[in-house]
Structure formats: C-alpha cells, structure tokens
Amino acid sequence: MRRKFVYTLWSLLLGFILSAALFVVAVERGWIGYMPDLERIQNPINKFASQALTADGKLLGTWSTSENRIFVATDSISPHLFKALVATEDERFYDHCGIDAKALGRAVVKRGIMGQHNAGGGSTITQQLAKQLYSGKASNTLQRLLQKPIEWVIAVEIERYYTKDEIMTLYLNYFDFLHNAVGIKTAANVYFGKSPSELTLTESATLIGMCKNPSLFNPVRDAERCRQRRNVVLSQMVKAGYLSADSCRMLSATPLELNFHPIDHKEGEATYLREYLRQILMADKPKRSNYRDWQYAQYYADSLAWINNPIYGWCKKNKKRDGSHYDIYTDGLKVYTTIDSRMQEYAEKAVYSHVALRLQPEFDKRKYN
C-alpha cells in the first residue's frame, strides 16, 4: 500500500515536471502565442516621430502617424520619474530578474482566491513592458491567461539584455499618455510644456499616476481624480524611502497645475516649411505617366531635382540596414533646416512692428477716407 502511494506520488511529480517543461518549450517556440525573436527584443520600439529642427537645435514640429513618440535617453529623464515608477509599480524592481514571485503569490491569493480585485496585480515593470511591446489585446479571459506566461519568459529575456535604467527608459518611452502624447518626452511637453529632465516631483508623480489607467486618471478630463492618484504615488514614494512624510504632506496639498497644450501639426512654427519638407523628403522618383500632357515642364523640373537635389526624395533614395526605405513618419529622423530661431524671431517682430506702426494705419486711412 505504501509502495503504491509512493509510486503514485512520484508519477504525479514527474508528470508535473514534464508538463511544465513541455509548457515552457511551447511558450518559447511560440506555439501558444506570439514570441518575439532576439532581434525584436533587442530593438523593441521601432516607431518614432521625425523632427524638424532649426539650425540652432530648436524643435519646429514633428511628423508622425498615430504615435507621436520622440525617443529620450536615460540621462535626459528626471530621476523623480524613475523613483515614482519603482515606488508605485514595482517596489522590488531592483531585486528581481523580471518576475517578482512574492508579488505574484500575493496577487494569486488576494485577487484569485479572496476576490480582492483592488489588491493590485503581480506584474513587474518588466512584465508590463513585455505586455505593452508584444501582447495584443486579449479577446477573452483564457487568451489573457495564456499571455501571462509568455510575458514572464519575455520579461526574463528583457532583463538579460537591458539594465534596470534602460528597462524603465523603454517603459516611459513607449507608454501612451493620451492626447497624442506617446512617450514621456511628448507627454512632458503636452501636459507641462517641459522636457522630461525639467519635471518636478509632483509633475512626475502625476504622469506616473496615469500609468495605472490613463483613461481613468486623465488630468484633463478629471483633474481631482488625477490629483488624488498623484497623492497615492507620493505616498508610495514615502513607503519606498524616496520621500519624507513631511514633504509628502506638503506636496499633496498643492493643486494639480497643468500647462496643457495638445499637439496640432497645423499649428506651431514654420508650418508651411514643414509641409514643404515633408513633400520633398517623401517624393517618389518622377514618372512621366504620373503627369498630364500639359505638365511636361513640371515633370522636367522634378526630374532635375531628383538628380541634382540630394534632399528631393531622400527617403526613397536611401535605405535602412534591413533594405527598406526610410519613412518620415516612423523612423525618428532629425531634419535640420537653415532657419535660425533667434533671427527668425527678430525678423517676425520687426515685420509685426512695421505693419502695426506704419502699414496698418496707412491702410485704415485709405480705407475710410
């Protein structure tokens, strides 16, 4: 009887080990869901807005599709953002290799067994990044359950190839903060009119608070709810040792101060120049069949431009390492113009002054006399 019990126990244990091994193989081979290859893991974000810049480096505007993302490096991001992110989303971020067993176990017990759906999940920052980068939206609960182990494997792979700071930088560069503010650089500008390195502690906490649910904690739609969420982030920073209790109380009492200005590609500086550059850079090689009979002169001029002007059709003349042509909307190009922003500002002020003091009064006098 005892021998039979031991035999059964060992059989179950062996069966469990074999099943687990088979499941891991199935995940790594992509049999139960999409598994990115090494190249995709090493180059996870492949869509960035291109920038039009003045000769002195001032941003005139961007070209993008639905994701107006501009990459920002780790050293150009405020440390407040990193501290707030770790304190709120993954308190043991620096201690695990992609999977936090303690947080996962807590989530299973509280959410799965005790039904406490507000207890928080067990996903680490790395797992959240894996989900954002590689998991599509699940159509049902079963599909979402199958996505989880895939994200665990991807998270471990990400931890192998990136430092902790690089993982957080990828996370912040990828996240969609709504209002066409994709990535932390665009979000800092849209919500506060700043670069990521200039964000204050409360501003950083506001943006990190959105990471839980950007639609729910939208500072434009519901400022008070967003302020409360910001204060939760500040409280978490106290628990993590990044902020004193006195500072937390003082900062929590401050109102939510936004400098919100959504991106509109039809507004801003040098809009006509930006549109001209877009057309020139993305121009195709002229074909006579694409021109009407009476457009021969235009065809001739465009053909000469294609041959003699390196900028004309630049995206179609040049190829990336993979052999595909450049795309101004997704490849993160930097296009420097000959405009000097300071001289341009002086010139515009001079024109406005001349029109207001001289031309406009003369025009009014002739109009009404």
Model regions and ranges:
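Coil-to-alpha-helix initiation sites in intrinsically disordered, low-complexity, charged segments
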Residues: 3-4, 124, 140, 305
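Extended, non-catalytic substrate-recognition/exosite surfaces adjacent to catalytic cores, especially
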Residues: 215-369
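Short, flexible segments with low predicted structural confidence
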Residues: 6, 13-16, 24, 57, ...
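Short aromatic/hydrophobic contact patches that present stacked aromatics
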Residues: 24, 71, 336
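Short, contiguous pre-domain boundary segments
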Residues: 33, 62-68, 327-331
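N-terminal type II signal-anchor transmembrane helix
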Residues: 1-53, 92, 112, 354, ...
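Peptidoglycan glycan-strand catalytic modules in the bacterial/periplasmic cell-wall system
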Residues: 46-244, 249, 257, 265-272, ...
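N-terminal start-of-chain detector that recognizes signal peptides
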Residues: 21-26, 32-33, 43-45, 56-58, ...
